[in-house]
Amino acid sequence: MKLLLLSMGLALVCGLQPECSRSEEDLSDEKERKWEQLSRHWHTVVLASSDRSLIEEEGPFRNFIQNITVESGNLNGFFLTRKNGQCIPLYLTAFKTEEARQFKLNYYGTNDVYYGSSKPNEYAKFIFYNYHDGKVNVVANLFGRTPNLSNEIKKRFEEDFMNRGFRRENILDISEVDHC
């Protein structure tokens, strides 16, 4: 009797989740299409960090996204960054991991990159756990398809990170700043 109930429960769960009957290859293709939605042009709108110096002018994470492409599940980013008053190109690749929504990036130390949330035609949020010189810092990026996102989206981003312990002065709206 217990086995029958367990079997019925499992059948019900699988019935509610169509992935149970799909092959891993089908799931992989679906995930790839989802990530492809992130491809194309983006703008850096808001930056947040546990260490403000990382996102201040000429800081290592004060980078202006131009484009994202997805290849084999890896995220390739083309950024502009300002060094010594000059804008220089910066190409970064975040490599997919076994964990959903997590990537690895070698830049200014090593980084665990998490894809937070998005509406792919409007905005995307990425969170970096940066390991550099024995310190761990958190950096968050809000990217928009246009340079100016609604105040509602920016406010949700700010509230989310203030609830995680960020101080308001460590959240910078750079939508009006010269992006090179």
Curated annotation (Swiss-Prot):
The UniProt keywords, alphabetically, are:
Disulfide bond, Glycoprotein, Milk protein, Secreted, Signal, Transport
Q: Which residues are glycosylated?
A: N67, N148
Disulfide bridge partners, by residue number: C87-C180
- For this protein, the parts annotated as crossing the membrane are none
Q: Please provide, in alphabetical order, the Gene Ontology terms of the cellular component aspect for this entry.
A: extracellular space
Tissues expressing this chain: Milk.
Where is the protein localized?
Secreted
Signal peptide boundaries: 1-15
Q: How does it assemble?
A: Homodimer.
Protein name (record): Trichosurin
